[in-house]
Amino acid sequence: MTATFAGIDATKHLIGGQWVEGNSDRISTNINPYDDSVIAESKQASIADVDAAYEAAKKAQAEWAATPAAERSAIIYRAAELLEEHREEIVEWLIKESGSTRSKANLEITLAGNITKESASFPGRVHGRISPSNTPGKENRVYRVAKGVVGVISPWNFPLNLSIRSVAPALAVGNAVVIKPASDTPVTGGVIPARIFEEAGVPAGVISTVAGAGSEIGDHFVTHAVPKLISFTGSTPVGRRVGELAINGGPMKTVALELGGNAPFVVLADADIDAAAQAAAVGAFLHQGQICMSINRVIVDAAVHDEFLEKFVEAVKNIPTGDPSAEGTLVGPVINDSQLSGLKEKIELAKKEGATVQVEGPIEGRLVHPHVFSDVTSDMEIAREEIFGPLISVLKADDEAHAAELANASDFGLSAAVWSKDIDRAAQFALQIDSGMVHINDLTVNDEPHVMFGGSKNSGLGRFNGDWAIEEFTTDRWIGIKRS
């Protein structure tokens, strides 16, 4: 069984400018997580395929980096246009391969287009500097140049956007790229980004994609001698492994790690309770809660706790859940049976540890209806760990200081939100939260292509978007010139 995207066989891998079958003995079966139908079957990539992709990238990179900035900009901008031109086809792929709802799929394409347009400006924004020397007659030039070849490992939750978030800036500043998409989303995370940039005019070899089992090619993809940077988005345990391999598994290379989250959504005593309750319902359950920035914990000042909980529960009970292809659905299926099993265990453990069930929807196949737990304490697993599903906990804070303490009671620090009618008060509170990103009177799920994105603690290393992406995907080189 085969499937296509933009006129090419979507079961193939783009390696060195050619769409080819993988050379692994393993066959990948691409499953629709909602109805369990088989989308396609394909031969996975092998270690030899990884070698071929990296060697093609190494061979093509220097010429690509030497391509005039205006030409690179035009190609990257054309990729953004192609994302829009192929929007409907991509939406259908995101729905059937990743379980995205129609609204989430459209949002994802918009986000991918935005970072691609932003990246189109990067070739003209890469600047070096000339520094004075303490030696007479000497000049110090610091050039900012492309890393070389970048390996991109992308996840299954926002596969298109979280591939392109690394691919577009990396290409724009002169790198070549090899993508290893998640096994659940080889098309939306690998084939589609590769095809879009190929169609836009990126030369052969500058972008490749190899979809294969992590157990077969994962370590080799990271430890290979060619890439100078591995950009990984995924879970914290796997991210730790990637970091260790990048340092200890072969020639040392840098890493950009965007990992897990456990986002707190803090409702202070003077918050707009109606607005906060509605926002929390969306921020917790968008894409089934399978977003690193999803609200995991709602922390509410005791003075407004009961009022908020009542309105939040009411909002959650009205969330449309079901077929992701239907207009208006907010919660669709979780990605696979492993995720489903983990969520079932978390639900039972929350009950066992003493949480009160406020909302407990049914579980139908991989469709997990929203669950809300109250009377949660910070030592319970549902509050400590990233959930990555449609489960949310509500914690009561004694006061503002206690709310800050609860917000920081996590090993993660990716995104957070605080709600208050007093903006200055909220801003001061935000500075107390050890998180890479904090949003006031807004969702924890936020991304703008020109604004820094990244976390603290166990949520990762490195920064994406705008000037921060330029720095991430380039390196400095000092050329000292002694004239006399």
Swiss-Prot record:
Phenotype reported upon loss of the gene: Significantly decreased growth on vanillin, 3-hydroxybenzaldehyde, 4-hydroxybenzaldehyde, 3,4-dihydroxybenzaldehyde, ferulic acid and caffeic acid as the sole carbon and energy source.
Pfam families named among the record's database cross-references: Aldedh (PF00171)
pH sensitivity of activity: Optimum pH is 7.0 for the NAD(+)-dependent oxidation of vanillin.
Catalytic machinery residues: 258 (proton acceptor), 292 (nucleophile)
Molecular function via GO: 4-hydroxybenzaldehyde dehydrogenase (NAD+) activity; vanillin dehydrogenase activity
Record-linked InterPro entries: Ald_DH/histidinol_DH, Ald_DH_C, Ald_DH_CS_GLU, Ald_DH_N, Aldehyde_DH_dom
Chain positions recorded as NADP(+) binding sites: 156-157, 180-183, 234-235, 259, 386
EC category: oxidoreductase
Phenotype for residue 180 to A: Less than 50% of the activity of the wild-type with vanillin as substrate in the presence of NAD(+). Less than 10% of the activity of the wild-type with vanillin as substrate in the presence of NADP(+)
Site keyed Transition state stabilizer: positions: 157
CDD domains cross-referenced by the UniProt entry: ALDH_HBenzADH
E.C. number(s) listed in UniProt: 1.2.1.67, 1.2.1.64, 1.2.1.96
Transmembrane intervals: none
Assembly mode: Exists as a homodimer, homotrimer and homotetramer.
Function: Catalyzes oxidation of vanillin to vanillate. Also oxidizes 3,4-dihydroxybenzaldehyde and 4-hydroxybenzaldehyde significantly. Other aromatic aldehyde substrates in the order of decreasing activity include 3-hydroxybenzaldehyde, 4-nitrobenzaldehyde, terephthalaldehyde, 2,4-dichlorobenzaldehyde, benzaldehyde and 3-phenylpropanal. Low activity with phthalaldehyde, cinnamaldehyde and syringaldehyde. No activity with phenylacetaldehyde, formaldehyde or aldehyde. Active with both NAD(+) and NADP(+). Involved in the degradation pathway of lignin-derived aromatic compounds of plant cell walls.
Name under which the protein is recorded: Vanillin dehydrogenase
Organism expressing this protein natively: Corynebacterium glutamicum (strain ATCC 13032 / DSM 20300 / JCM 1318 / BCRC 11384 / CCUG 27702 / LMG 3730 / NBRC 12168 / NCIMB 10025 / NRRL B-2784 / 534)
Organism lineage string: Bacteria, Bacillati, Actinomycetota, Actinomycetes, Mycobacteriales
Gene field: vdh
